[in-house]
Amino acid sequence: MEMKDFIFTSESVSEGHPDKVADQVSDAILDAILTQDPKSRVACETMVTTGMAVIAGEITTNAIIDYPKIVRETIREIGYNDSAMGFDWETCAVLTSIDKQSPDIAQGVTEGEGMFKEQGAGDQGLMFGFACNETPELMPMSILLAHKLVSRLADVRKAGVLDFLRPDSKSQVSIQYIDDKPVHVDTVVISSQHSPEVSYEMIKEGIIEEVVKKIIPANLMDSKTKFLINPTGRFVIGGPMGDCGLTGRKIIVDSYGGHGAHGGGAFSGKDPSKVDRSAAYMGRYVAKNLVASGVCERCEVQVAYAIGVAEPVSVMVDCNGTGKIPSKRISEIVREVFDMRPRAIIEQLDLLRPIYRKTAAYGHFGRELPEFTWERTDKAAIIREKAGL
């Protein structure tokens, strides 16, 4: 059998990337609303550009929210605190245009209304979950390292270790795989916004020493590993001044970095009645527990819904040929162990809480924070038992 030898690349972006600023603002607003009224319906979109943030969407809530204050606090925490950056939390304009959720949608989602008694899905659509045993977090290594690089960039910026850095940055990691196992980091790309007076040599040396070498395992690098640091040579203009940022523009960064499939729905700014978010989290929960159980080494789960209907129209489990038991039995176990109806997902994962701002940068998956209930592997034992392993 021919050996599989290929290079796979994933990217991530920092909390200061304009699209991620928008995601974090949308989720900060969602958290503020859920804190006061957990049953709220929220679809909050954000656009950020030079000197301005625009908030729009459909929100039905009893909460009383100071939208400009939340927007400004989020921008301040990210680090846009100087008008020289073209975006400053104290001076940026905040425009809002908020409507209520359509009653036609609401009756299909609200329990006891619409054509079905149970709480239905907030929309039609297909969502995917993924897990693999490449890393202890059961995430693909390329996206995990890409997230850790930009997270480290933010840490050294805020701590003053590399005080010339500014908030906007991106990373990209290319990994050589042999027979689907990561063996070598081929290329690391980092682009980070910086203050105008610093030399390129200082930027490159600082990022390689304080970021790359602190994150990329030494055993995966050698003399052939390529480091491309700020490859244009200059990155002073960045953030919302450099590019307009929009909620939901980084769906592959938010999920699995190109590994597995994606249904197209974004996460941020959406309350958990929206299955784009809650069912994607549930898909990760199912896939991660299957891999953690030892039933398979790699797993992709697809779930699909019709608007207003509680039961999924389909659930698919694909172990990419790594299953230790027949695929049909794995699918049966998933149906026996996991309830994929929207209300059940919300209850199992405890999603009516203000936990979403943390998800909005550095990945929704693979970060084992206490709030990230979909990262638990508490179903692995019962899966093993049912599989007879």
From Swiss-Prot:
Alphabetized, the UniProt keywords read:
ATP-binding, Cytoplasm, Magnesium, Metal-binding, Nucleotide-binding, One-carbon metabolism, Potassium, Transferase
- Which reactions appear under catalytic activity for this entry? L-methionine + ATP + H2O = S-adenosyl-L-methionine + phosphate + diphosphate
Q: Which residues bind L-methionine?
A: E58, Q101, D243, K274
One MF term in GO for this entry?
methionine adenosyltransferase activity
Pfam families noted in UniProt: S-AdoMet_synt_C, S-AdoMet_synt_M, S-AdoMet_synt_N
Q: Gene3D superfamilies annotated for this entry? A: 3.30.300.10
Places the protein is found: Cytoplasm
Q: Where does ATP bind?
A: H17, D168, S169, K170, R234, F235, D243, R249, K250, A266, K270
Any one Gene Ontology cellular component term annotated for this protein = cytoplasm
Family per similarity comment: Belongs to the AdoMet synthase family.
- Record-linked PANTHER family: S-ADENOSYLMETHIONINE SYNTHETASE
Any idea what job this protein has? Catalyzes the formation of S-adenosylmethionine (AdoMet) from methionine and ATP. The overall synthetic reaction is composed of two sequential steps, AdoMet formation and the subsequent tripolyphosphate hydrolysis which occurs prior to release of AdoMet from the enzyme.
The entry's protein name is S-adenosylmethionine synthase
Could you tell me the gene encoding this protein? metK
